[in-house]
Amino acid sequence: GGKLLFMSDYLEQQIPFGMYINESIKSGQVYWSWGMDLGTNFIGAFSFYLLGSPFFWLSMPFPSSWYIYIAGVIYLIKYMVAALAAFLWLRRQVNGENAALIGALLYAFSGFQSLNLIFSHFHDVVALFPLLLLAVDLWVQEGRRWPLALSACVSLLTNYVFFVGEVVFLAVYYLVRWLIPDVRRGLRRLPGCAALGALGVTMGAVLFVPSVLFLLSNPRTQQHGVSLLFSKEELLYLVRSMLLPASSMHSPDVLMETHWASCALWLPMGGLVLAVIYCFGAKKRDWLRRLFLLCLLATLSPALNGAFLLWTQSGYRRWFYMLLLLAALAAARVLDVPEAY
């Protein structure tokens, strides 16, 4: 086989941070970090990266000097968990296991994953996200409580910034998937869903509260306000991200200079073609069709796109993995019953 080379943030942040967190925890220096600049809050500095990730904690039994080697193995585990978690959710949405398996692999190896290889902690979030949707479905359909509370807690601990976007998505998902088609059951299950989510947040408060207090002192979090339209170059970049595998973010191309927004909406084996076919073949009131088109519309406007980051002036598209999971489900449904489309 060939060689997979990592660069930029992976070598400058991910590996050094992993080694440093390992050393700090084992030495008991978990309140204040003297190794970052002139010193900073340890939890506030590293809770966005690796501190609360269950994948990172797999490396803790080993010496910090081993992390550079263990990180590659952990990367493989993240892809396996992403595929397994997606399969568990997709399997409930289609009849055939093969279609669910293909959809799970499309999600796990999506363009969003390959584009963000230098940001290894993004893959933690992608791997665990399908479990949140599965937990919501289990609560609504079967009344199972703990999966939702635990998945909310683990997702929050893994990355509180991405969790904010996931809460926004889950609110829209619940509305389109459960409330609109069946108002009575949707309203009956809604208070419990909110309470279980709040319980999960409470359990994750050990990292969440210090992180929020740390962020409040950062002036960049106060920069709100977005425009209504993307530029022509950004729209072309978005369209290309749906049709072709993403190019490297740190290398300029014909459309943009360096572009760190994580704009990638490509699935292996044809991009979003199968998802588009599904939208044309599905009923107009189909929940997946509605939700997919609604999220696709959100990608076209900075105002709607910014809702997943509380309208901060970042311009990031780092919620696209959620849309790609919907696209993977649409593709799985087409492959499950191709004659229907």
Walk through the language-model features, giving the residues of each.
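Alpha-helical transmembrane segments of integral membrane proteins
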Residues: 74-78, 121-124, 159, 163, ...
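Membrane-embedded helix bundles of polyisoprenyl
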Residues: 76-92, 98-140, 144-179, 192-212, ...
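Transmembrane helix-loop junctions in multipass membrane proteins, especially transporters and channels
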Residues: 2, 64, 142, 178-186, ...
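Transmembrane alpha-helices and membrane-interface helical segments
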Residues: 84-88, 131-138, 170-178, 274-280, ...
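Membrane-interface helix-boundary motifs at transmembrane edges
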Residues: 91-95, 139-143, 179-189, 279-288, ...
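Periplasmic/ER-lumenal interhelical loops and adjacent helix-loop junctions
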Residues: 12-21, 47, 54, 189-192, ...
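Membrane-helix boundary/interfacial segments in multi-pass membrane proteins
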Residues: 4-5, 69, 113-124, 253-260, ...
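Active-site lumenal/periplasmic loops and adjacent helix-entry segments of GT-C-fold
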Residues: 1-93, 98-130, 154, 158, ...
